[in-house]
Swiss-Prot record:
MF GO annotations: glycosyltransferase activity
Keywords, in A-Z order: Glycosyltransferase, Transferase
Pfam families: Glycos_transf_1
EC number per UniProt: 2.4.-.-
Transmembrane segments: none
UniProt family annotation: Belongs to the glycosyltransferase group 1 family. Glycosyltransferase 4 subfamily.
Domain of life: Viruses
Broadest EC class assigned to this enzyme: transferase
PANTHER family according to UniProt: GLYCOSYLTRANSFERASE WBBK-RELATED
InterPro entries: Glyco_trans_1
Protein name in UniProt: Uncharacterized glycosyltransferase 335
């Protein structure tokens, strides 16, 4: 069977599309990936995978509508979408496959049809390659920052990511707990604009977001002692699951959709202190952004730096992540 996958150029979206294609090819399908909604290669099946981003949705919906053959529309939705700016005719007969129960709820909130969710998965071939990088990365980190605990963050800078709160965490940890801060270092992969912020000496900008291979990002997760995911709303939250697959415990808020796949026992979860509603015009969504108290995040970081069971946590998280193998989850697209 010839299959076309229509997607977007965001790195996280492209990665999932490549994984879907890999599973389909292993099962005998001939797959072409396109990022142009105005040109769909000849195919018997079409899979659209894009974020539910109302301002840019119409061309993709039209391509889906026009396609004659089997078709599936897979999506992620971080908040309640504004469908007033979307062509209602093109929406009416689409049954969306969400990537989480949370994405499904956001779509259902505005009356859209949803199928059973297909969680994002882990490509364990990439994990295997990334694990080969980890010893070298750890060796360099231990040489440059001996006898310290390393915390990693991979995050964009949109409002919902809560990186503004992390800047406060960095500063308060260093001012209120200087002795503890001496043994802690933070390593950040983010957008270049992050470097415009004044941060303490133990906060290091490692690389620009979206410009590294997947193996490098997974290797980065594996080289850290802990990963922090400060985000306040996500359609899914791949950094949490990817870190788990590399055996690195994650500090994150207890909130949907993380609570659909995280480990309450082996990750470190902090409570949300409030939920802020914010309409983002650029994304055409109303976000419910979970916020945490600065002190709660600091306490979680300090607790993590003192834990004695980090290796047990690592083993358990790797075991849990195996449930989310792309070769099991993405067989849904073979239908």
């Amino acid at each position: 069977m010839k299959t076309a996958i229509l997607t977007m150029n965001y790195s996280s979206i492209s990665n999932v599309s490549e994984d879907i294609a890999e599973v389909l090819r292993e099962n005998g399908e001939i797959v072409t990936i396109t990022k142009n909604p105005f040109y769909i290669p000849k195919a018997e099946k079409l899979i659209v995978f894009i974020p539910f981003h109302p301002p840019s949705l119409n061309p993709y919906l039209y391509a889906f509508y026009q396609f004659n053959g089997k078709k599936l529309f897979y999506t992620t939705c971080d908040g309640i979408p504004n469908i007033e700016i979307v062509n209602k005719y093109l929406l009416q007969d689409v049954k969306f496959i969400p990537n989480s129960k949370f994405s499904a709820m956001n779509l259902q909130e505005v009356g859209l049809q949803t199928d059973l969710p297909v969680f994002h998965g882990i490509n364990f071939k990439i994990v295997e390659n990334a694990e080969k990088l980890v010893p070298q990365l750890k060796q360099k980190l231990d040489k440059d920052f001996p006898n310290t605990i390393k915390f990693g963050i991979v995050s964009g800078l949109t409002k919902r990511k809560n990186m503004d709160l992390m800047l406060q965490v960095f500063n308060e940890l260093n001012t209120k707990y200087p002795d503890i801060a001496k043994k802690i270092h933070f390593f950040v992969i983010s957008h270049k604009q992050f470097t415009q912020n004044e941060v303490p000496a133990n906060v290091h900008f490692v690389a620009e977001f979206g410009f590294n291979s997947r193996e490098y990002i997974f290797g980065f997760y594996g080289a850290m002692d802990y990963i922090i995911v400060p985000s306040g709303t996500e359609g899914f939250g791949m950094p949490v699951l990817e870190s788990m697959a590399m055996g690195t415990p994650v500090i994150h808020q207890l909130m949907p959709p993380f609570d659909e796949f995280t480990s309450w026992q082996w990750n470190l979860l902090i409570k949300s202190s409030k939920v802020e509603e914010y309409y983002d015009k650029e994304h055409g969504q109303k976000w419910k952004i979970h916020k945490f108290e600065i002190e709660d995040m600091i306490n979680a970081i300090i607790l993590a730096s003192e834990l004695q069971d980090r290796e047990e946590r690592s083993t358990k998280l790797k075991e849990l992540a195996k449930r989310y193998d792309i070769r099991n989850l993405y067989t849904r697209f073979l239908e």
